[in-house]
C-alpha cells in the first residue's frame, strides 16, 4: 500500500533501473515496463488500496496474453525469462501467505514479495553482460530497500 507520492517516487526509480538494466535494447526495456505494469496492477488487485478499473484489467490481459509473448526480447530469451516468471509469481504468492505467520515467516514474506526485482539483473546480463548484472543487482538492493514491516 502506498500513497500517490510514494508511487510517483517508485515510478522514478523504476524508470531509472529499467533504463540501466535494458541498456540500449528497446525490446528489453519494453519487456521490463510491461512486467512493471502487470506487477502494479496485480498488487493493486491484491491490496485493494487503489481502484482497479476495467481498463487496468484489459491492459493486464493484453500485456500477459499478447504483448509479452510477442516481444522480441522475450521471444529470444524465453527459456530464461519464463522460468523467472514462474519463480516471481510463486515467490509473490507465498509471500502473501507468510505475511500472516510468525516472525520468521514475516521476514521471509518481506524478502519474497520483491523477488520480481530479480528479473532486472538477469535482463542486464542478457543485454550487457556479467559485470552489468552485478551492478544492477547492487543497485536494486539500494533503490528498493525497505525496512521490515514496510
Regions found by a protein language model. Name each.
Residues 1-150:
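All-alpha prenyltransferase/terpene-synthase fold signal
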Amino acid at each position: 500500500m502506498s500513497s500517490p507520492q510514494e508511487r510517483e517516487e517508485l515510478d522514478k526509480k523504476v524508470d531509472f533501473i529499467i533504463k540501466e538494466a535494458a541498456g540500449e535494447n528497446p525490446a528489453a526495456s519494453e519487456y521490463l515496463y510491461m512486467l512493471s505494469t502487470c506487477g502494479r496492477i496485480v498488487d493493486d488487485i491484491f491490496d485493494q488500496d487503489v481502484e482497479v478499473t476495467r481498463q487496468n484489467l484489459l491492459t493486464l490481459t493484453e500485456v500477459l496474453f499478447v504483448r509479452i509473448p510477442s516481444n522480441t526480447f522475450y521471444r529470444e530469451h524465453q527459456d530464461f525469462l519464463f522460468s523467472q516468471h514462474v519463480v516471481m509469481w510463486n515467490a509473490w504468492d507465498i509471500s502473501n501467505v507468510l505475511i500472516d505467520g510468525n516472525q520468521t515467516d514475516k521476514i521471509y514474506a518481506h524478502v519474497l514479495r520483491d523477488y520480481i526485482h530479480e528479473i532486472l539483473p538477469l535482463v542486464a546480463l542478457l543485454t550487457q553482460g556479467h559485470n552489468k548484472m552485478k551492478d544492477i543487482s547492487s543497485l536494486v538492493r539500494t533503490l528498493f530497500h525497505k525496512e521490515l514491516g514496510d
